[in-house]
Amino acid sequence: MKGDPKVIDYLNKALRHELTAINQYWLHYRLLDNWGIKDLAKKWRAESIE
């Protein structure tokens, strides 16, 4: 499929931002879980999956 390179670039940037956000939520979930803050960790995990 061929597309406008500028549009594809914008979509790739948006995807990169979303994946970065997911990784940050997951990292914070793991840290909170490790520190014993289980209730907040569950919320961050759910947010990372959303």
Swiss-Prot record:
InterPro entries: Bacterioferritin (IPR002024), Ferritin-like (IPR012347), Ferritin-like_diiron (IPR009040), Ferritin-like_SF (IPR009078), Ferritin_DPS_dom (IPR008331). PROSITE patterns: BACTERIOFERRITIN (PS00549), FERRITIN_LIKE (PS50905). The keyword Metal-binding applies. It comes from the Bacteria. Its cofactor is heme b. GO terms for biological process: intracellular iron ion homeostasis; iron ion transport. GO terms for molecular function: ferric iron binding; ferroxidase activity. Binds 1 heme b (iron(II)-protoporphyrin IX) group per dimer. Residues 1-50 form the Ferritin-like diiron domain. Its EC number is 1.16.3.1. Fe cation binds at E18. It catalyses: 4 Fe(2+) + O2 + 4 H(+) = 4 Fe(3+) + 2 H2O; Fe(2+)(in) = Fe(2+)(out). Coiled coil: none annotated. The keyword Metal-binding applies. Keywords: Heme, Iron, Iron storage, Metal-binding, Oxidoreductase. Homooligomer of 24 subunits, arranged as 12 dimers, that are packed together to form an approximately spherical molecule with a central cavity, in which large amounts of iron can be deposited. Belongs to the bacterioferritin family. Iron-storage protein, whose ferroxidase center binds Fe(2+), oxidizes it using dioxygen to Fe(3+), and participates in the subsequent Fe(3+) oxide mineral core formation within the central cavity of the BFR protein shell. May act as one of the electron carriers in the reverse electron-transport system from cytochrome c-552 to NADP(+). This is Bacterioferritin. It comes from Nitrobacter winogradskyi.
